[in-house]
Structure formats: C-alpha cells, structure tokens
Amino acid sequence: MFHYLLPRRLSLTCISIFMSLAVGLSAQMQVEALQRGLVAIHQDEGFYLSWRLLGTEPYETGFNIYRDGERLNQEPLTGATIFSDPEGTPESSYVVRALLDGAEVDESEPARMILNTEGPNAGYFDIPLQRPETGRLGGTYSPNDTSAGDLNGDGHYELVVMWNPSNARDNAHRGITDDVLLDAYTLDGELLWRINLGPNIRAGAHYTQFMVYDFDGNGRSEIMVKTAPGTVDGQGNAIRKGPAENADHSAIYRNATGYIIEGPEYLTVFDGLNGAELDTAEYFPVRGDVSAWGDSHGNRVDRFNAAVAYLGGERPSAVFQRGYYTRLTMAAWDWRDGQLTRRWTFDSDEPGNESYRGQGNHQLSVADVNNNGRHEIITGPAVIDSEGRGQHNVAETINPDGHGDALHVTQMVKGDPIPYIFMPFEGAGGLALRPAHSPEYLWYFHEGIDYGRGVAAELDPEVLGFHFWGSGEVGSNLFNFNGERVGNSPSSVNHVIWWNGDLSRELLNSNTIEQWHIRENRPTRLLTAEGASSINGTKANPNLQADLFGDWREEVIFNLNDTHLRVYTTTMPTEYRLPTLMHDPVYRVAIAWQNSSYNQPPHPGYYIATDMDFPPAPLKIKTP
C-alpha cells in the first residue's frame, strides 16, 4: 500500500513568470577553451566522424571535412556534427574546418583514430594505467572514480583517476585501509603525476571527493581535495604550505579500529599540470567534537561531499560538505591569484539553521535555482544559496528525515526556466518531485519504506516528457511530470546517458546501455562492454560518464582488468545539433561532482528532450 499525496498549493505559472524576469541578468561563466575534439571511428565500411560544436561559436556554424587534404562534402555541413566516409582507411588523416560567413576560419587537429568497435553502436580505445603495487597492509588497487579536466591547457581532456585499495571501508565498518592515490593520464595513457593522500586519509566512498576544474581561469584545471599529514604531492614532496608547514608527516593518526578521528585535516589545491602542491588551508568544516555529528566512533563525522559551483556568476568555486545524517555543514572555497580562501560557511548548528539538520544526501547537485546567473547547492532535501544561506528544506513539507541516496536536478518541462528536484527518501520513504526553489512538492508517493534509488529522465521519444521511477512498489511504475502512471519502469534504476541519437536518454547500468520502450515494456540492448566492468559494487557506476569529445553525446569509461580504462563512444547516427555539453556550466560542474559519494549521472542546465525548441538558447559563457 502506498499513499499519493496530492500537489501542494503552488502556482507554477506565477513562479515561471517571476523566474523568467531574472533571465538575461547573468554574467558570462568562464569555461574551458576546447579544441574541436574530432574522432574517426572504424566501421565495417570506412569511418564514422564526430566533432564538437563549441558553445562559444554561432549555432549555424558550417563545417567542411577533409581526408588527406581532399574535401569530402559538397555543401557545408550545418546539421548534426557527424559524417560517414565509406572510403576511409586506418591510414587516413581527417581534419574539420569551421566556416564563418562562407569562409573557412580554422582547422582542427587531426582526428583521433579509433579502430576498435563493440558491435554496431560503439567504438572504443584503451588507456593503459600504471597500477600501484600492493599496499603495505595488503590492499590491491583498482581504478575507481575518475574525473576530467584540461590539465595542460591544450584544449583536450585529461583524466584524474582515483586508485582505491581492496581494503577500503564504508564509514559504518571498522578496518585499517591502505592509501588512496590520485593519478593523472592523457587519453593516450601518459602518466603525468601521482598524488598519495597518505595514511591519514581513510579509503572509502565517503571520504575522498576530488574536484577537478579550472578554478583560477588560467586555462588549466587544478585539483582540490581533502589532505592530511602524510600527503605527498605529484612531485614527490610532502605538502608544506599553510598549516601543513610544520606537519609531522611520519605521524599516524588512525586508531586501532581504522577510524581517523584526531589529527590535522587540510584542504589542498594541486597544479593539474604537474601535481605540485599550490596551497593548503585548514579543512573546514572542522571535525571538533566527534559525537556532535551523531555517533562517537567516527562514522557520521566523516561523511563528506563536494561540488563545483559558479557562486559569483563568472568564476567557479569549490564546495566541501561535512555531515548530513544530523549536523550538516559546508564551506565554499576560491582559488584566485595563488591563494586558497574561504568564501563562506554554512552550519546547521548556527541559530536559524536548525531545521537543516539531517537534510542531506549521499551526493550534491548544482543548478541556477533562482535563474539569476549564480549557482545554488542542492543537498537533496535542502538548497543552500550562492551566498551560503539556507534557502529552503523539506523538513516540514515532505520528510523531517530528508536523507536520500539519489538525486536528479535539471529543467524538466519545455518552456519552463525552473529546474526541478527529484529524489527518493529513506526513513519514511517515498519519491518526490518539487521545484528547486521551493520545499512545496508537486507530488509525493509515500510508501513508508527505504527508497534507495530513483531516476528522472525522458526515456522514450514516443511518450513525450520526463519520466520518473525508483525502487520499491511505487518505483515499479513509471510516472510522468504530473505524477500520472504511463507504464512500467525499467529494471535499471541507475545512470541515464545520451547515446542512440534521439533526445531521450538511455539506461546505463553496470557495463550495459539499453533503450527502454515504454509502450512495449521492453529494453533494446545497445551496448555490452565485453570484458569491462563497472565500479562501486552494487552501485554499478561507470568510472566516468561525460561528453569528452565528438558531438554532444556522452562517452562512458569502464575499468578493464585493473590495468586499463576502456573509453566507449557512440557510432549511432543523429539528426540533432547541440553544442558540446561540456560548455553548459551546469553539466560541466556535474562532471566534477559526479565522483562525490554515491555517483549520479550528470544533467544539463537547460531542457533537452524530444519536444525541445531549436536552436537552443545561446550559452552565456566565455573562455580564458
């Protein structure tokens, strides 16, 4: 038995009008200066080519394709940024040239040639990794969460890979772990550097979130992560900046049960180019009295999340959160002009913030909730505004124990500038949809059991609009935006990805991608990544899901035998032209926060679905 709670008193028409008034007031957000990202993928006959439309160039930009100096297209290509060349060979060299007012204005670098295919719908290549030796405590290493950034400023993405030891532990379980390592690799497999977080950072899903982003606008990404005495940077040096200047790097602060509930805690920013320490500050929120977080042995005090957000509108900041089961705290940080400074802090223990206790998830999301050109931080049941003030939480409207395990935030209605929040709840349980600026839900299915998963996305172009589903009895139904049942839900309640060429998303679960047909109540398998595996156990996440190159659709990365990463890209045709998702700031910061605790799929900052308008509104961005 479940209860369908009817919509709260909320005038969406009035809200939409109000929110629309704010559109156009925002500054341009700084994003990466990307290259064209041209790839050529081997097919049964010839090659399939795919490249970026940049968010900084006119939507109508035309392109010419050249193979070995010969132009292949008769008329400029003004549709989807893909092209098939049936006469290409592995020895061919491809470039694409952009046209402005009929004249060619730039030429891409030669295409990355991808010679391996997985069935008719995907190409792939492998990135060799330098697997660490077995740890001092017997832990063997596997590549875990991965992030992307332009570390050297060449306009191409590099990868930052977290190595997790096999003796990693959840916060709820005792045990001593080996060290956590961060590696940086080019897509060709060159190891750029390795950071060792040391023995005073415990290994586990909730301990280390690493933010990879160009925080200072110098055209290269930095890495910001929690550190401690014993952390060694990518140049082989113990960290020595700020409060770490006189740190005892030989000290071991973990106790006999493996928890680390004493000793210094830092936040360090590292140079993406060489892994060198740039600056270190005292980590905030501080640990303080361990029992103030809900237990005394070290579980809830060390529940961390992190994200990147454009809090001031133009430049990105990092946000690090501590605690969500009881006390909820976070701090925003800026890396500017060679200094790491705290922008603001939020603490549910401060007067006026008491209702925010327990109002947090196992992840964060980021969106422009107020449509004012600045990002807010969504903890799931709560929203913290761009100035570090609590905007709202659902303690009184939905669930006093607002904690949940999944979170989806994006624009979900055509023509509506409001982002919406969909999430499952633990405790009293259920699935709820609400506008991101309000605690008042549109609908709330309340079953009274723990809902561990929930997803929001348009799944089928034949059934227009966003679809919502989750685990549990209610979750076996598929709902539309109005809370009406439209079919059965798929068995996958995990990631969603743009893959097959339409504007709906496909199901990404474990090492498979499937298209769900609502009316036929069945999936179509599009990809099985043979030999590759997902990460995080039953969470079955990819190492990374992101639009790394090629057209606007997403790539997916899996672990291959702990020695390689395998990168898959679609070869399915599309008729749609969109700028690279990585130039949409909301999507781009989602790639940064994707590695936070329970990984969630990235969503864009504007409405992408079958009934969207074309061309999409220009992105308000600039490059360094």
Predicted segments, located by residue:
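Bacterial N-terminal signal peptides
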Residues: 11-24
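Beta-propeller-forming repeat regions
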Residues: 31-35, 46, 53-58, 76-624
